[in-house]
Amino acid sequence: PDLCLSDEFQAEPKQLSVNFKEVDHVEKAIAEADVILVEPVVQPDYTKSRDERTGELSLTPANYKITREVLEKKAKSDAILLHSLPRMDEVPVDVDITRWSRYWQEAFNGVVMRMTLLALVLGAME
């Protein structure tokens, strides 16, 4: 599938004077990034168990995967890597223990934030 941004999608940031560029490989953009936000390129079918969708496990094109090697060769030492989770194959598990990984903290902070918002909405706190 064509993974380029459509003209329609590019129009809005251009109208807002957002400075962006489109590249065909993460290695071309990662060296400049302070924050690397990764999302699945192809959305898996979550109605099936992981065992049932074994054929889907290699859905991310290699040029869009954030591997440990790419991070070690290209990323800034103080950059952070975020992911909304759950992940498929776009970020291999060996990236979890690198200095860039912040997605587990991101997930924890999201739980705390949702708990706080629920408590506020339900009147348990002011």
Describe the role of every protein-language-model region.
Residues 1-39, 44:
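Glycine-rich phosphate/diphosphate-binding loop of Rossmann-like nucleotide-binding domains
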Residues 68-78:
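Short, conserved loop/helix-junction motifs that constitute active-site signature segments
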Residues 78-126:
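Adenosine-phosphate binding glycine-rich loop
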Residues 3-5, 68, 108:
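Donor-nucleotide binding loops and adjacent catalytic segments primarily
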Residues 40-65:
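Glycine/threonine-rich flexible loop motifs
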Residues 10-11, 50-53, 95-98:
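Short, glycine/charged-enriched secondary-structure capping and boundary segments
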Residues 26, 67-68:
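Acidic, amphipathic alpha-helical patches
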